[in-house]
């Protein structure tokens, strides 16, 4: 159920209420929050890379979401510098990060997936960018494929009119166009950097999301209040794509399709909701057909029903977001991806073809050649 909460994002309360370990008196300049749930096999690579950073003024907070694979014991025995926040249950990516944020002390708050390995100069590059772009409230890292390190996972994301977030550079070679800073709509939550002052103004993650699209929602709120996001090419992160999440399971489908509606209805200005309605309808029809092909029609429909059940609280959150918005609808429209409808339809068609049996994929290619 959607809760109103103290704001339209996650709680900003402070204090050591969750039994976190190893709290020093001096606050570090940066807090790195790593979420873990039964990911012990990733932790040596992730935490050792943090230990090797050239920039040293930071703390690592590992939030363990009630793991049963010995993750907590492994961290205590092998990484004594890590502040371990052991939760008694799985609060999801969203709830785990909110717990970490409530204990973080740095002026820069960095979220990092446990299935990553960061370059030794990762933090140094982030701090150089923070000094170079004081007007930016957030920063996106260059995420490369873990097993193919010259190919991009993402360099932040842009937003389309239908509510689709497009991972910038996904699957492309790491060429010259990805070696210069640029403004992007937002940072992927797998390696995202936020200024504390921005989070204290716009709120952190919305704890109703649990997982997926919480990063899009946060970046959307930040943009609406005038906080830009910069891509930092030197902040290199190697990422096991979906290393900690299975693709196309019912739970993932439910949260992704519910939360897509949550962030879209909560943040999109009314003028653009009306303007983009035909595109949004086409998007929903295409999404439903796609999930039917995957045998995921039930969780898809359950997600949409859940949105309707919680529409009242969601609209109250929307009122707060729109009341504090400083960005005009026209300015937001100019920030969005060009040719969004065409991009969405091509993306859906590519997914359809990938989900079809091989014989039908061959037929679709023949049909394309004839038309």
Question: What are these language model-derived features?
Answer:
Residues 160-185, 200:
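Short, flexible, basic/aromatic active-site loop/helix in glycosyltransferases
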Residues 72-103:
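Conserved donor nucleotide-binding strand/loop of the catalytic core
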Residues 228-335, 339-343, 354-357:
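Active-site-adjacent helix/loop segment of glycosyltransferases
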Residues 28-31, 59, 217:
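Cell-envelope/extracellular polymer assembly enzymes that use nucleotide-activated donors
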Residues 48-57:
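Short, acidic, metal-binding catalytic loop of nucleotide-sugar glycosyltransferases
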Residues 109:
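Short aromatic/hydrophobic "clamp" motif used to bind/position activated sugar donors
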Residues 185-236:
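A short, conserved alpha-helix in the catalytic core of glycosyltransferases
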Residues 116-160, 164:
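Conserved donor NDP-sugar-binding/catalytic core segment of glycosyltransferases
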